[in-house]
């Protein structure tokens, strides 16, 4: 078994508005190994996106903890969490969230700029990542000049440019047609093999989830089962 990279210990999340309490996550526990490709499957409102926010240190659990590479996130300062997100984690969303006034190359380079890399390294690494997703010829195009599939590929390149150990993906193909969705998942698998990057994908789509090596099901804020989807149609 691969070394554990990320571990969730009894994560709970409760939101309170006035006298109204809403429990979104209930004692969620699981782990992700180094280089593992995992899917969490659930319908809209099951708590998947909230879980990803906690895993990425974008929100704080009501109770429980997230442990990344042996380090509890509850012990990290806000600055340390930001550094972790920049250096060790990648994020892919259903919507690409590219900066509209910047080129594909500049969008991919943004995490490197934030990480204060050297200018020459920034350009070469960003261009190499665009090449890895098959878009080096679109480096100087803005998002409005790219197709939906191309924009999502740029977003994936941006998520991977710092060579993160884990990528958290929230419905990464939700806005794509079947052909582009298939292409994106082939790309994730290739990057996993070449770079050893671990992927945790949340989705409602069983056809996409079965491409991962492991699948968990989430219902009403609880992990309810480990699925076996290899033969799913």
UniProtKB/Swiss-Prot annotation:
InterPro entries: AAA+_ATPase, ABC_transporter-like_ATP-bd, ABC_transporter-like_CS, ABC_transpr_LolD-like, LolD_lipo_ATP-bd, MacB-like_ATP-bd, P-loop_NTPase. SUPFAM superfamilies: P-loop containing nucleoside triphosphate hydrolases. The keyword Zinc does not apply. It is a peripheral membrane protein. It holds the Pfam family ABC_tran. The keyword Amino-acid biosynthesis does not apply. Its main location: membrane. GO terms for molecular function: ATP binding; ATP hydrolysis activity; transmembrane transporter activity. Its EC number is 7.6.2.-. Residues 6-233 form the ABC transporter domain. GO terms for biological process: lipoprotein localization to outer membrane; protein localization to outer membrane. ATP binds at residues 42-49. It is found in: Cell inner membrane. The complex is composed of two ATP-binding proteins (LolD) and two transmembrane proteins (LolC and LolE). PANTHER family: IMPORT ATP-BINDING PROTEIN, LIPOPROTEIN-RELEASING SYSTEM ATP-BINDING PROTEIN LOLD. Part of the ABC transporter complex LolCDE involved in the translocation of mature outer membrane-directed lipoproteins, from the inner membrane to the periplasmic chaperone, LolA. Responsible for the formation of the LolA-lipoprotein complex in an ATP-dependent manner. Belongs to the ABC transporter superfamily. Lipoprotein translocase (TC 3.A.1.125) family. This is Lipoprotein-releasing system ATP-binding protein LolD. It comes from Shigella boydii serotype 4 (strain Sb227). The lineage of its organism: Bacteria, Pseudomonadati, Pseudomonadota, Gammaproteobacteria, Enterobacterales. The gene is lolD.
